[in-house]
Curated annotation (Swiss-Prot):
Enzyme Commission identifier(s): 6.3.4.4
Gene: purA
Name of the molecule in the record: Adenylosuccinate synthetase
Similarity annotation: Belongs to the adenylosuccinate synthetase family.
Cofactor(s) annotated in UniProt: Mg(2+)
Organism of origin: Mycolicibacterium paratuberculosis (strain ATCC BAA-968 / K-10)
Residues the entry annotates as binding Mg(2+): 13, 40
Record-listed substrate binding positions: 299-305
The organism's taxonomic lineage, starting at the top: Bacteria, Bacillati, Actinomycetota, Actinomycetes, Mycobacteriales
Subunit structure: Homodimer.
Gene3D superfamilies in the cross-refs: Adenylosuccinate Synthetase, subunit A, domain 1, Adenylosuccinate Synthetase, subunit A, domain 2, Adenylosuccinate Synthetase, subunit A, domain 3
Amino acid sequence: MPAIVLIGAQWGDEGKGKATDLLGGRVQWVVRYQGGNNAGHTVVLPTGENFALHLIPSGVLTPGVTNVIGNGVVVDPGVLLDELKGLEDRGVDTSRLLISADAHLLLPYHVAIDKVTERYMGNKKIGTTGRGIGPCYQDKIARIGIRVADVLDREVLTHKIEAALELKNQILVKIYNRKALDPHQVVECLLEQAEGFRHRIADTRLLLNTALEAGETVLLEGSQGTLLDVDHGTYPYVTSSNPTAGGAAVGSGIGPTRITAVLGILKAYTTRVGSGPFPTELFDENGEYLSKTGGEFGVTTGRRRRCGWFDAVIARYATRVNGITDFFLTKLDVLSSLETVPVCVGYRIDGARVNEMPMTQSDLHRAEPIYEELPGWWEDISAAREFDDLPAKARDYVLRLEELAGAHVSCIGVGPGREQAIVRRDILAARP
């Protein structure tokens, strides 16, 4: 059976949690393959209960699904334990959550360095969440990181943390004038936290590949979005990992030939959190409308998201770099009651029309959107469950976005609830 990748096709916050939740009842495994608690998924159950998840895969809310925090994720132990407790206090069974032995641990010195660095950068800062994600990935690449499996051996763990803090404390004290961290305290705190998750540590690569060989279906859930990818995003205003489809194989240990479908999540308009270029950003009453009606505030940071019209240039780019086979278009209901809905179909850069993603960031910063005006609709579409239930103008909008983005819009979100979705093509049944 297949492995299916679910990725954000914009700058994150597209509604990936809703998509995972919709598919979750028909897959056996849900895997988070990159990122950390710098991203959030919101899932609204049919009961009206609202769950905000940061580290734990959205499949935890679906009974019978085994959830995996993959080797590509950076795990803050305190956040993990708090999130588990929050779920368990609300009656959610978390017994089927596993953590890759090779995932990296995010520790207090990562957070400290992240925060002081952003403060030091001032107006030149990237706009990170300040949760230590970047510094943790830096340690991973520098080969001085702490892996989840290290908590199983006190001696190894102590040696690694002492070695890491020799450098980190020099940075904190001599560059940023902060207090040094005590390696003994860091070790003891981590070992105490590990008591709450050591039973979840597993060789998840082996388990996932064995599951695929046994005919089970694996859903690989990315966090953030394509334009935040460290290689393919709007660098340097990006995250420190690869949310794109290629990162799914690396961050889970599943071979790329196992992946049979890539589901891109697209919001019916565009949002972004933090600094960086955003050609269709709105600063008028339309931006206010999208922000207020769409509830555009970050799940993790609480920061207000920047809002703009749908950008077909970045949608096409996402289709290309991810090999997207299907789209899930979310928040179509937010656009109801607009007289017209502009869609960016290209850019004008220094007087010349550009239809594809600019090669340089300086060009993207200068890009002016070229809009195609589509007629809006006034009807409430939140109760639509079939494509034909939508007003004709809403259907036309979806079909035009499908044409511009270059892949089939297989699902459409018309509200925050699990059941508020239209399925035009069954993602799982359509796969070989």
